[in-house]
Amino acid sequence: MWAIGGVQLNSRLLLGTAQYPSPQLMSDAVKAAGVEIITVSLRRQLSPQKENYFWDLLRSLPCHLLPNTAGCSSVKEAVNTARAARELFNTHWIKLEIIGDEYTLQPNPFELVNAATILVKEGFEVFPYCTEDLILCQRLVDAGCRVLMPWAAPIGSGRGLMNTYALQVLRERFPKNILIIDAGLGRPSHAAQVMEMGFDAVLLNSAVALAMDPVVMAAGFAKAVEGGRLGYEGGMIKARNVAKATTPLIGKPFLIEKP
């Protein structure tokens, strides 16, 4: 059991709702993984031309909605989108995304901090999508963010942890903040590695939605997240450069050479 934004949760896996072959597969994947928080894009997925089936399906799931500002590239766009999301979904949670480069989808750190400062003052619980840069994360915490969502690698790349050292530093420097890896994971083993490092949760989208079988993959990631967390809580042994026997010598016969 853990808590985020005043909400008690069991699952440490969050799922995005985009790119699935069908809304029903998305729903099945969410249920298979036992997910309790799902993200949704107001700008990319909400359209007056679309049928209400998708939104009805989202609301039917036993999950908390975390709207995001995907597609925004400025403070003004992100803040306006966040305000609209609060009205539409009746939540003060917002996953803050402000992209600074369309090729790498790397967040714009300057706009991100400015937008976070505004939204925190307006009462939002801000979940900022950021890089693993220590100074950026410190500025976000100083702005009032209690949650940080650093990437492991660029969105949708599936590359896994590109900078393990920097991520470990974040965990050590922000022990009281909730840290959720937000992008770049491609395999369940990546998720297990993140959780073994002490991160609080993992957010996935492409790795599940674009898998050959999203439902099976969602279940696999859920088990990996759980296993990694248990490994962290259990206290893993430290790696050694030499072998250490595990079998005691008590009761084991041995020869004594006569002088």
Curated annotation (Swiss-Prot):
The active site is at residue 95. Keywords: Cytoplasm, Schiff base, Thiamine biosynthesis, Transferase. Pathway: Cofactor biosynthesis; thiamine diphosphate biosynthesis. InterPro entries: Aldolase_TIM (IPR013785), Thiazole_synthase_ThiG (IPR033983), ThiG (IPR008867). SUPFAM superfamilies: ThiG-like. Its EC number is 2.8.1.10. GO terms for molecular function: thiazole synthase activity. It is an enzyme of class 2 (transferase). GO terms for cellular component: 2-iminoacetate synthase complex; cytoplasm. One of its GO terms (biological process) is thiamine biosynthetic process. It is found in: Cytoplasm. Coiled coil: none annotated. 1-deoxy-D-xylulose 5-phosphate binds at residues 156, 183-184, 205-206. The keyword Transferase applies. It comes from the Bacteria. It catalyses: [ThiS sulfur-carrier protein]-C-terminal-Gly-aminoethanethioate + 2-iminoacetate + 1-deoxy-D-xylulose 5-phosphate = [ThiS sulfur-carrier protein]-C-terminal Gly-Gly + 2-[(2R,5Z)-2-carboxy-4-methylthiazol-5(2H)-ylidene]ethyl phosphate + 2 H2O + H(+). The keyword Transcription regulation does not apply. Belongs to the ThiG family. HAMAP family: ThiG. Catalyzes the rearrangement of 1-deoxy-D-xylulose 5-phosphate (DXP) to produce the thiazole phosphate moiety of thiamine. Sulfur is provided by the thiocarboxylate moiety of the carrier protein ThiS. In vitro, sulfur can be provided by H(2)S. Homotetramer. Forms heterodimers with either ThiH or ThiS. This is Thiazole synthase. It comes from Coxiella burnetii (strain RSA 493 / Nine Mile phase I).
